[in-house]
Amino acid sequence: MSEAIPAETDVQSLISDPDTPIIELKNVEVTFKARTGSLFRPNHVHAVQGVNMKIMPGKVLGIVGESGCGKSTTANVMCGLQVATKGKVFFMGKDVTKRSAAHRRHIGSVVSVVFQDPATALNPRMTVQDQLADPLRVHKIGTEGTRDKRVRELLGLVGLPLSALNALPGQLSGGQRQRVAIARALSLHPKAIIADEPTSALDVSVRAQILNLLSDLKKELGLAMVFISHDIQTVRYISDRIAVMNAGKVVEEGDADTLLNHPSDPYTRKLLGAAPSLLHPQLD
């Protein structure tokens, strides 16, 4: 049986300890049944193999790799959207591999997710006001008045005007929609955000703005973050540490500057030698 997760007061004290990971994966594997094969001899896809990772308080872990390398599946295990086939998942040092509904609710209030495409992450029929207030209502936080105040605070945090409150997602630009998605992720005062390709669906001119916003929020709020991208130069821009994934495995992990200036794995060198990001036309 999994250990009880910490109470809210315990969570706050543990998060203040820079040596206690918010989320930790130990030897995690995720296997899916493939559509090929037969009923009696099904084929399996090993999406994640033996992954070890930590989300540390106030730090940004970048996960980089090509499409299909397992980075998004790994992130889904971290936030509870995917169950690990093997291995262990820890939340504040407690084993939550077999998560109950209470586990998921509690972790969801501490770790939020920003998805790749804000157009699909937001309800097209809900105004920005309702999108941002909804998590507070679901978790029964505050009164209508305090929720309205929090919604306005969130707009300010992500640089949107109050005039956006009554807008529907379809009336906003891609960059504005992603700002709303980020604001929604911040609504419950999380201590960590998992950002899964948060700039890849945006125009090049908007990507730097969103990256700068995430970087500013990390500093202002003391957020931990997992930043996922196929572009190693974009990951470099925001990360303290970087994990490079290939074929479901972490092939290299380390301090961002050290890993990028002195890569030890051929796959990392391949990523660095690929076409440079438009955000960084020249490598150091």
Give a label for each model feature:
Residues 168-172, 176:
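Conserved ABC ATPase signature
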Residues 64-66:
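The feature captures the beta-strand-to-loop junction immediately N-terminal to the Walker
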Residues 95, 146-163, 272-273:
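Conserved ABC ATPase "signature" region
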Residues 189:
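Conserved catalytic motifs of ABC-family nucleotide-binding domains
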